[in-house]
Amino acid sequence: MSARAAAAKSTAMEETAIWEQHTVTLHRAPGFGFGIAISGGRDNPHFQSGETSIVISDVLKGGPAEGQLQENDRVAMVNGVSMDNVEHAFAVQQLRKSGKNAKITIRRKKKVQIPVSHPDPDPVSDNEDDSYDEDVHDPRSGRGALANRRGEKSWARDRSASRDRSLSPRSDRRSVASSQPAKPTKVTLVKSRKNEEYGLRLASHIFVKEISQDSLAARDGNIQEGDVVLKINGTVTENMSLTDAKTLIERSKGKLKMVVQRDERATLLNVPDLSDSIHSANASERDDISEIQSLASDHSVRSHDRPPRRSQSRSPDQRSEPSDHSTQSPQQPSNGSLRSREEERMSKPGAVSTPVKHVDDHTPKAVEEVTVEKHEKQTPTLPEPKPVYAQVGQPDVDLPVSPSDGVLPNSTHEDGILRPSMKLVKFRKGDSVGLRLAGGNDVGIFVAGVLEDSPAAKEGLEEGDQILRVNNVDFTNIIREEAVLFLLDLPKGEEVTILAQKKKDVYRRIVESDVGDSFYIRTHFEYEKESPYGLSFNKGEVFRVVDTLYNGKLGSWLAIRIGKNHKEVERGIVPNKNRAEQLASVQYTLPKTAGGDRADFWRFRGLRSSKRNLRKSREDLSAQPVQTKFPAYERVVLREAGFLRPVTIFGPIADVAREKLAREEPDIYQIAKSEPRDAGTDHRSSGIIRLHTIKQIIDQDKHALLDVTPNAVDRLNYAQWYPIVVFLNPDSKQGVKTMRMRLCPESRKSARKLYERSHKLRKNNHHLFTTTINLNSMNDGWYGALKEAIQQQQNQLVWVSEGKADGATSDDLDLHDDRLSYLSAPGSEYSMYSTDSRHTSDYEDTDTEGGAYTDQELDETLNDEVGTPPESAITRSSEPVREDSSGMHHENQTYPPYSPQAQPQAIHRIDSPGLKTASQQKAEASSPVPYLSPETNPASSASAVKHNVNLTNVNLEEPTPAPPTSHVSQADCLGAPSPEAPHTMLRDEGVSLPSHVDPAKVYRKEPYPEEMMRQNHILKQPALGHPGQRLDKEPNPAYDPQLPYVEKQASRDLEQPPYRYESSSYTDQFSRNYDHRLRFEDRVPTYEDQWSYYDDKQPYPTRPFDTQHPRDLDSRQHPEEASERGYFQRFEEPAPLPYDSRPRYEQLPRTSTLRHEEQPTSGYEVHNRYRPEAQPYAPAGPKSSEPKQYFDQYPRSYEQVPPPGFTSKTGHYEPLHGAAVVPPLIPSSQHKPEVLPSATKPQPPPPALTEEEEDPAMKPQSVLTRVKMFENKRSASLENKKDVNDTASFKPPEVASKPPSASLVGPKPVSQTQFSEHDKTLYRLPEPQKPQAKPPEDIVRSNHYDPEEDEEYYRKQLSYFDRRSFESKPPAHIPAGHHSEPAKPVHSQSQPNFSSYSSKGKPETDAMDRSFSEKRYDPTQAMPPPPPLPSQYSQPVPPLSNSSLHIHSKAAQSEGNSVSLDFQNSYISKPDPPPSQSKPATFRPPTREDPPQTFYPQKSFPDKASVNGAEQTQKTITPAYNRFTPKPYTSSARPFERKFESPKFNHNLLPSETVHKPELSSKPPPSPKTLMKAHSSTQPPEFDSGVETFSVHTDKPKYQINNISTMPKAVPVSPSAVEEDEDEDGHTVVATARGIFNSNGGVLSSIETGVSIIIPQGAIPEGIEQEIYFKVCRDNSILPPLDKEKGETLLSPLVMCGPHGLKFLKPVELRLPHCASMTPDGWSFALKSSDSSSGDPKTWQNKCLPGDPNYLVGANCVSVLIDHF
């Protein structure tokens, strides 16, 4: 480069360039970090030169690097590490890792005059020209710009002031020239200290550059080129911009008077234009930068510190420093740069605009200027605004980190365009300014129309002009609404001065691309949409605002909800800032909830009389809604935490958790000591935690463990410390007592109070939670989950405030001004206010909450406050939680805590890139809180406990990566159904986990496997722990929460699936609070909690609303939300609503599976999932805090509830209700045994839920719309399948109700198995599943899944799904499950759930241990199901063993049938054989796959269910798509759970499985059905049968390993396979397709539906002619609940593939049409598969689609690779 530069220079200036090397040591400064931005890198070469150097792209004014580094300096080394040919991210990382000091070696280009003694008068300009060229590249590369700038910047810097003013390159040069008569000389001034001054006063003059021939001036002869213009028409021109000068001349009205001074030396004329332009650009850019910095400096600074990493992920343009801007709000900086530059460079228009944008784009502002200059010369075209959104860096973060990011480059280009034609217009305002504005902060404010005859029109303003400044107010970074209001607010008659620039082409592009505003906001109040186009939201949700003047009117903003993975989910209308502030003020003024919070508030006031009362009030306050200091809308950007974020733990064992972390991991965690408050403060035991204390801990590279109140958390968020807030969700009061007795026997805190406080905390402050972990009192799996959650949160991106917090956090928090925190400035020092609970809490009592909450601090009396405070002490304000709305704000809580505005979501989900979207976090947070709140409302203490219990189960199951989420979700799910149900679930889960897998194991599992494991464990544990006891006890614990709900809403429960109702009831109780959200919180909290964890993992599901499905969904997603929210909103009656008014679990799951938020919707499902922790749902929770999990949880709850219920009733999940509330359970059972199967299938759906959560885009769309789109897409894809589907469409509910025998024929292993398998391959979106009353033992087994085995299997299989599928459900089981499914297909999944419960009945360890092979092969396990399903169904509360058996057989059957479809289900299904026992006739020896299933039915089945449900569910969680799709599908579908079995497995499975199936045939599997349930709405992808098929295959291998021969055989298609399903209730066959294929392959498609199966050559063994069929069904019982009145429909069809058990040597591609989203990448898809022939929801397993090589989501269809049916 130096050579090139030298050449250029010598060519132009007789000078050469040399590289000087300098080494500087930078000290990280609080607000600035190192104060530099870097660009370039191997992966981000200069867009023109291709240079890959790391270049200083920006040096912050007043920052540590000012005076030491310059723009365009090339970074040679950082702390001794070479920066040559490294990637941008690496360079950023090195800077970030450098701690407080960084030793940076740079190369700086220096121009040397060869011929002339002067260093480089001309050469300087030349060089600069060269540099400028580089800069030009830079705008895009970001690196080049940096590099160029640095060379010239040092030069330009010295003269930056003058340059800024110098409007044109000449004037700038001229000042230089004037100082040097001969030629320009390069002068470099380096400050030795920051406050040192250059001592220059610069000015710019306008000179005559050229006189055209034959012009007036030429003829006059008095003006010569090079003359300096001193006056124009009497106006002094010094420091006047060229634009202003031009305007003056244009306004001369035919007579131009000028005063000029002759420059004999013509110095200005001799200054090279290019070089000069660059210089001036640099200088002005510099100035612009400073101005911009002032605007966005904070962000910029912060970004500099931390952004490098971020920017890296973001986009090359963002560069580390730029990333700062961009993360912060690149738009803003860019605008700022633009406007300041333009102002400064009025004389040189080109430089003005570009620098600004460039600055945004590239950290270095100078570069931008240069770029502008060059662009101006080279191409005046403005980059299209659109590119801004699609910047290189953005891919990492789904959303553009900040609109400005994209804009910057545009700005640069625009500058080039704008520069030449600036105009200064002055006029007096009449009645109006007479302008119509377009654009926004992302692209600039443009004149869209000028009123004729208005002063503005007369002065020359016209359409297409960009307004750069009005009355000295910069318009470059202003949102359109502000611009309009500013103009409107100008007093009539006041003189208006508008600096504009003609940019007609840019304007045209802006109008065509419909861009304008683009910035991110986090909400800090709850809002219910007021119109169908509105978006409802909870606290902590993040939106991208794209139009602040929607429809050209003030009052509404067009915003896009940001969901999981920071993806844009749905767009709609939200109130504008002013209205939002009004609404928020009302919310904070009035009591949030109808009774509880307000009553509590007054109660606290009354209690203050005594110390005890004070303590109590403090405790209560901790749970009170936080009154935040945040504005209603907080501008946020996505950033990485550049420091170890403080950790706040809330929950009944928060004190134990803090001490355990600090004791066992002293080098990672340290408890922040509290200091006494000022004198007289009190009684409160603890004082406050000083921010300084926190900072000291952070400086030691440790997480500060804070014992603070939720208010303190909010304040920390406000101060931008963005603590990681983990909520340990208790399973029950008894669970809390048990855990505390075990963990801290000396503690005197009251378990009841701790539990109640936790419940309230979750209800009111869930939005503060970044993660929720469900506690299982049976084990300590929560600990591993806690550590994993903290690690994940730390690694996630965080939504942080765009600017510094206004004012330091007051109170006792002593925070420094650098409240930006490292998040804002990675290198910045933290300033934290004391986050001490007392200190931060709104109330004094709350303030000491941390202390009070601590066990030690409180006695029994104080127990309450003590226990709760830890939970409530710090709630993740950043985490969006539905609950929040309900009890979010209490009058009590005077001062708003620092809501983790910036980081709710991000923090919550560690796995997310940096952090979840606010909405995600909200979802996570809200899920926990809602969970609590539902419990709280119905039975605040009981409910909370229940939920907590669920959490525990989840925790145990999958503590590590997804434990917090999974735990939370599971717990939530469990809790939601009913206070006790959650309890039960937790226990089951706890039992299962400890006995079978140590929490650590579970934790360390892959996210999906973990989840599955967790679920497995959960299921198993309960069963293992105490089958009978569990049921009896669980019904109470698990059902307790439900019972309260059920009791309160017995009728409702009856209407809805019990678990669902429990959730609903939960919510209902809450519903007393006017806010449906509250309601939702009550029940959704669980779901949300679960979801929130999932959200953590999946950015998309972050939607708080989604999480709070009932309420938020409604407002948020009109179509889906309507249905979801419809029932969810009134949790009292929600359950029935979602379920097509079916009380059955199946229906319920569906409801909970609502497209919008599958998991949230079906609170029951979430609960179900957790409750039936043995079920896939349980795994789903762990699987991650994905939306699926959410869903899963609810269904789980449902399912889990059933375990207790099943105890009381074998027939349905309803038994859960029965257990908790017998009547509801019974109605459910009575309603439809089939439903139970459905419920079971939903268990797999929980994973789907997670996915759904993940796919917020789905939610925004109405289900109907999605369905239509899906169908359209489907039509092409599923043509062939359709025929088969019609014939084979299965009806899980029907199947369930029907005797499995009818469906499955034991004697017919192959044909029926095939069919069964095919049916099993039912790919359907997960839907809540009703846990079936099946033997807990069976359930346990079904849930039982060796997490390790499962995980390993997955790896072997290319996808965990495959492995899990195999392990969790053998083919034999699948058929059984299938048949059972007709009778009770859901059983399979339900079984897993029940497995939890049953596992209580039988040792969890046993189930877990045998999870894969044992389970599969465990005849005993299979045997428990033997009791006839019908009898089971009929039995309201059969003995545990009986129930267990019943469920088992049913579940096994159903699961076996749908294995292919839902891998998770597959696993569960595999256990189908047990159900087959109950129906030997039904079970027929399955084909290859069936035998394994049959073989393992007893144990295998539960194991399978567990594995599938848990691990696969987790996987399924990935898709955000589920969120929008009907919950059921999503919950069941695992995005990638497709259990794609590697060919080896297929080979073994094909023949062997068939053989094995006959073995299993001892327990005839129900007719296998593979359900490919693609919901039209959200989960078509997840439904991919391919996934299910793989699942089957995968499962088989596990089971099959022991008894499968590999000889290939054609799998017979049972005649009933194609027809049977139709008979089942709830199955409506839309289309069927069948054909005979050989090794040559082919395509089987259904034209009507667009479903197709593409069989590759070699998929079928040589010499075999295999009949293959599929049925496209609409299953009313199996599918997730949809609100048909609201037009909700499934996005994808439900596809049952057959013959069941058929394995392929090569995966076949199942294509399901869908139109869930406008853009394929905007949605996440949840795929469900089931090995159950009936496709009962219980057997549905979530398939993890996202990222799975076996699945592809296209615009119109979802492709899933399936290796078996």
From Swiss-Prot:
Entry membrane topology: Peripheral membrane protein
Any single GO CC term annotated in Swiss-Prot or TrEMBL for this entry: apical part of cell
Positions of the UniProt region annotated as Disordered: 102-189, 296-363, 825-941, 1023-1042, 1092-1585
Ranges of compositional bias, category Polar residues: 325-338, 1442-1468, 1509-1519
Record-annotated PDZ domain positions: 23-110, 186-264, 421-502
Residues with PTM Phosphothreonine: T185, T267, T354, T809, T846, T848, T854, T861, T868
Subcellular location: Cell membrane; Cell junction, Tight junction; Cell junction; Cell junction, Gap junction
Repeat listed as a keyword: yes
Residues with PTM Phosphoserine: 125, 175, 178-179, 212, 241, 275, 277, 280, 284, 290, 294, 297, 300, 323, 329, 334, 337, 353, 617, 622, 810, 821, 824, 828, 837, 912, 1071, 1365, 1411, 1542, 1614
Region (Actin-binding region (ABR)): 1150-1370
Biased composition (Acidic residues): 123-136
Single GO term (MF): beta-catenin binding
PROSITE patterns according to UniProt: GUANYLATE_KINASE_2, PDZ, SH3, ZU5
Keywords: ATP-binding, Cell junction, Cell membrane, Gap junction, Kinase, Membrane, Nucleotide-binding, Phosphoprotein, Repeat, SH3 domain, Tight junction, Transferase
SH3 domain location: 516-584
Post-translational modification remark: Phosphorylated at tyrosine redidues in response to epidermal growth factor (EGF). This response is dependent on an intact actin microfilament system. Dephosphorylated by Ptprj.
Functional note: TjpP1, Tjp2, and Tjp3 are closely related scaffolding proteins that link tight junction (TJ) transmembrane proteins such as claudins, junctional adhesion molecules, and occludin to the actin cytoskeleton. The tight junction acts to limit movement of substances through the paracellular space and as a boundary between the compositionally distinct apical and basolateral plasma membrane domains of epithelial and endothelial cells. Necessary for lumenogenesis, and particularly efficient epithelial polarization and barrier formation.
Subunit structure: Homodimer. Forms heterodimers TJP3. Forms a heterodimer (via PDZ2 domain) with TJP2/ZO2 (via PDZ2 domain). Interacts with OCLN. Interacts with CALM, claudins, CGN/cingulin, CXADR, GJA12, GJD3 and UBN1. Interacts (via ZU5 domain) with CDC42BPB and MYZAP. Interacts (via PDZ domain) with GJA1. Interacts (via PDZ domains) with ANKRD2. Interacts with BVES (via the C-terminus cytoplasmic tail). Interacts with HSPA4. Interacts with KIRREL1. Interacts with DLL1. Interacts with USP53 (via the C-terminal region).
The protein, known as: Tight junction protein ZO-1
UniProt organism field: Rattus norvegicus
